[in-house]
């Protein structure tokens, strides 16, 4: 594992451990995996591609309706949540949670992790 990848993996492990996150990933804006700590039943490559597509679509939609910059995307289902947030101009942070998680705490943890990821991915 490269040094940068190991640093990113550690950031993701901390996010998962401290914030009731079941899985997380740092991905490129074009949908490639940089680093991940995901459950075994989640295909990281598919998650990366879909999360990048969703984030890009949300950013375009918000821009088109003149509402500034999209900060995060939240998808909720009965089984859990999928959240994405930008981690600078080059990366996106993705998190998977249970449905009953404290969303505020997860988003705060994601903000801190995204700032760390942005510094590493420059």
Language model segments and positions:
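Non-catalytic interaction/Regulatory regions outside core domains
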Residues: 1-122
């Amino acid at each position: 594992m490269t040094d940068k990848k190991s640093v990113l993996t550690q950031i993701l492990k901390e996010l998962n451990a401290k914030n009731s996150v079941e899985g997380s990933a740092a991905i490129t804006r074009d949908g490639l995996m940089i680093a991940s700590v995901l459950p075994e039943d989640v295909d990281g490559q598919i998650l990366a591609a879909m999360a990048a597509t969703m984030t890009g679509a949300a950013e375009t939609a918000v821009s088109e309706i003149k509402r500034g910059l999209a900060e995060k995307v939240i998808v909720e289902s009965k089984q859990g949540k999928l959240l994405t947030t930008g981690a600078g101009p080059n990366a996106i942070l993705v998190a998977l949670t249970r449905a009953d998680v404290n969303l505020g705490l997860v988003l705060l943890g994601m903000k801190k992790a995204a700032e760390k990821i942005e510094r590493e991915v420059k």
